[in-house]
């Protein structure tokens, strides 16, 4: 599954989802569109394998 697919699935659950992706000390977060534009084409497995990546998703 690609990161964008995961984000889109989670985004369906909330009216204002907020997604944070943390990777190797670099934190990118914000609206799902921002995250998808940056990391969306990576698969979740490759994202995590490339470094200690974490995907934190908060749904309001």
Protein language model features and the residues they cover:
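Detector for the mature cores of small, proteolytically processed
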Residues: 15-60
């Amino acid at each position: 599954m690609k990161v964008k697919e995961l984000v889109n699935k989670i985004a369906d659950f909330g009216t204002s989802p907020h997604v944070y992706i943390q990777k190797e000390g670099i934190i990118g977060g914000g609206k799902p569109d921002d995250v998808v534009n940056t990391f969306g084409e990576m698969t979740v497995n490759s994202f995590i394998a490339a470094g200690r990546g974490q995907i934190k998703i908060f749904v309001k």
